[in-house]
């Protein structure tokens, strides 16, 4: 069990005491994640924009992931930096921008979502000829790029009376298809 005391303490098969042998069936949490990066947020609100009643709010949120190390905690399984791997949830950059006009009788919200270009995975060895032997830790692949995406959403609310409002939301208003991603299942 690779000298790991958490594993070694989970069983005894050569006990000198009669009936002292045991196997403790339990989950072991040896995996770890280490991440670094930063978030940015800014917002501003105008009252009576352009002399109109109500308010106009803009807000932007950004995230940059510099490093996202995943370690299975098992010898023979390589530690992988998944930052920039767009098949998961860790693109290098992602942004969310929101603009809202809010009035007593209604509101309208525009939202933009964007994430940066990336790769399918950082574990791949990219090559076309003279490739090394493909392994579980470092499989070979001839193309490892995934385009980023931009999505535009719109939503709103209408106040019917003091007790009722109606809401609507359309995600991906322009029906932008996601970038194809290779799957194993």
List the predicted regions and their residue ranges.
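Short, glycine/acidic-rich beta->alpha junctions
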Residues: 90-91, 147-149
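Outer membrane beta-barrel transmembrane domains
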Residues: 125, 133-144, 151-153, 157, ...
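Functionally engaged cysteine thiol sites
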Residues: 1-10, 127, 131, 151, ...
């Amino acid at each position: 069990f690779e000298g790991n005391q958490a594993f070694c303490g989970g069983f005894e098969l050569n006990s000198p005491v009669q009936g002292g042998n045991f196997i403790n069936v339990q989950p072991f949490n040896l995996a770890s994640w280490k991440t670094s990066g930063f978030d940015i947020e800014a917002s501003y609100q105008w009252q009576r924009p352009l002399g109109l009643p109500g308010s106009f709010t803009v807000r932007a949120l950004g995230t940059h992931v510099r490093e996202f190390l995943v370690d299975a905690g098992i010898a023979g399984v390589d530690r992988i930096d998944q930052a920039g791997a767009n098949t998961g949830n860790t693109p290098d950059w992602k942004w969310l921008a929101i603009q809202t006009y809010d009035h007593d009788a209604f509101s309208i919200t525009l939202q933009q979502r964007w994430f940066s270009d990336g790769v399918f995975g950082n574990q791949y060895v990219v090559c076309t000829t003279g490739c090394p032997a493909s392994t579980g830790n470092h499989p070979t692949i001839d193309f490892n790029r995934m385009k980023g995406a931009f999505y535009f959403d719109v939503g709103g609310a209408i106040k019917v009376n003091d007790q009722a409002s109606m809401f609507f939301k359309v995600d991906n208003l322009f029906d932008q298809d996601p970038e194809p991603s290779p799957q194993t299942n």
